[in-house]
């Protein structure tokens, strides 16, 4: 949909320390003429430098959608949101990452009619999870030929999914002497050849 505001409506000024900032409205004085409804809440700076929100808007408006059908098996649904363009016109890249490092990857061209969907399987079989490692699948859709205002190889859509793959947690094995517990009246005693703790079950004190 239409975005308001597109651009921050400010003028470049310097503060008392000489630092530059984009000024608007009351920045020019309490009684300075101002419409009162213009401010810096756009998607780009007054000099057209993009804000981080630009990436979010691009994602929301992209014409290719991705859904996880069975992420553990690498099965995803790709939807062509175009109304008149077949998705085979574009290249779909996929990468499997382990802690940000690509361990598998490839690219395909899928024949998906406008407003249609198709399932695609990323080869994650045989992936052995390592302790402390997160696994993700990244998708990127790029142009294969120049279009008006868009060069070849430009990314028109992207997405990322975490794979529900985790290594079994290693069982902690203590390397100290074995502990033994005994109870004597109101006292619980935990001891080994190196330590001796006495817990008073009434007061909670430890000696």
What are the language-model segments listed below?
Residues 2-77, 82-88, 93-102:
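Extended substrate-binding grooves/exosites of carbohydrate-active enzymes
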Residues 69-71, 85, 113-117, 130-132, ...:
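Surface-exposed coil/turn segments at beta-strand junctions on protein surfaces, enriched
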Residues 75-82, 122, 137-141, 194:
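Buried hydrophobic-core signal for structured, non-transmembrane domains
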Residues 90-92, 97-141, 149-151:
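Intrinsically disordered, low-complexity Pro/Gly/Ser/Thr-rich segments with frequent PxxP/GP/PP motifs
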Residues 106-109, 151-152, 160, 193, ...:
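Short amphipathic beta-strand/extended segments with alternating polar/hydrophobic composition
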Residues 146-174:
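Short beta-strand elements
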């Amino acid at each position: 949909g239409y975005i308001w505001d597109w651009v921050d409506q400010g003028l470049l000024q310097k503060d008392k320390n000489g630092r530059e900032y984009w000024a608007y409205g009351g920045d020019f004085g309490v009684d300075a003429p101002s419409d009162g409804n213009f401010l810096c809440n756009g998607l780009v700076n007054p000099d057209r430098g993009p804000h981080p929100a630009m990436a979010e808007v691009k994602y929301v408006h992209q014409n290719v959608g991705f859904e996880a059908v069975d992420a553990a098996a690498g099965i995803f649904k790709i939807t062509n949101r175009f109304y008149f363009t077949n998705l085979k016109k574009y290249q779909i890249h996929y990468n499997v990452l382990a802690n940000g490092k690509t361990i598998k990857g490839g690219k395909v061209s899928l024949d998906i009619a406008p407003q249609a969907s198709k399932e695609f399987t990323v080869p994650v079989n045989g992936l052995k999870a390592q302790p402390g490692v997160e696994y993700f699948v990244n998708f990127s859709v790029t142009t294969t030929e120049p279009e008006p205002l868009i060069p070849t190889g430009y990314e028109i859509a992207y997405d990322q999914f975490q794979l529900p793959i985790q290594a079994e947690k290693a069982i902690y094995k203590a390397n100290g002497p074995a502990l033994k517990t005994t109870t004597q009246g109101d006292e619980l005693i935990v001891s080994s050849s190196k330590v001796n703790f006495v817990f008073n079950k009434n007061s909670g004190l430890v000696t």
